[in-house]
Amino acid sequence: MDAHSVNLVNNDKPVVVCCGDSITHGHIGYDWVSSLREKDNSKIYINAGVNADLTWNLNQRVDDIIKHNPDYVTILIGTNDAIGSQNIKHIQDYYVETKGLPRLPHIDWYSSELEKFIKTVKFQTHAQIIISTLPWLGEQSDAKIITVVKAHNDVIRSLSEKYNLTLIDLFKHFEDLIDSNDSVPYTTTEWRRLRGLRAVFYIMYLDGAGIELERNID
């Protein structure tokens, strides 16, 4: 059930639109939106996650979200912004070419686009907005990408406070777990093991975030 395929005519259930990228879409990883839908039939859960989207892309389809007149909007977006903001040419070129970006990703652009999306939803709907920090990327706390993710999460926390949003700190769900993994990253057998564990972690921790989300939309 995505943002383009839902018929809400004559349906008085509260509408929850879950906005984001592949983490929300759930096609590759754990589909936490479907899990919420299965656990709670008192609301309509609409999956507005699109694989590989950046926040700019989310703004291009904001009208599809608003038209559902949501009671709740969840936001989990920025992982691709964080990855693309690294000064690595082939990664940046990939996002520009495949996602039709008008410029190279940058944290300042992320902040601007995220605030734009929040303001649009806040002022054009009556929805309660629930925003989440980004999850970890990789398994090592000293990896360069973690510094990038933390900077993007600072943006999320700041905007959450500025606009009085409900914050779910998904990053913290991963933090202790990742810190406890002192194995050598990405060796062949270890990488296979971590791939399997990651699937379990996503089920455990994203489902945990889903439960936390459920509490916030009662």
Give short role names for the model-derived ranges.
Residues N10-D12, S35-N41, N57-I217:
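Alpha-helical cap/lid subdomain in secreted, periplasmic
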Residues M1-D2, W56-L58:
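Short gly/ser/thr-rich secondary-structure transition/capping motifs
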Residues S42-W56:
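A short beta-strand-loop structural module common to alpha/beta enzyme folds
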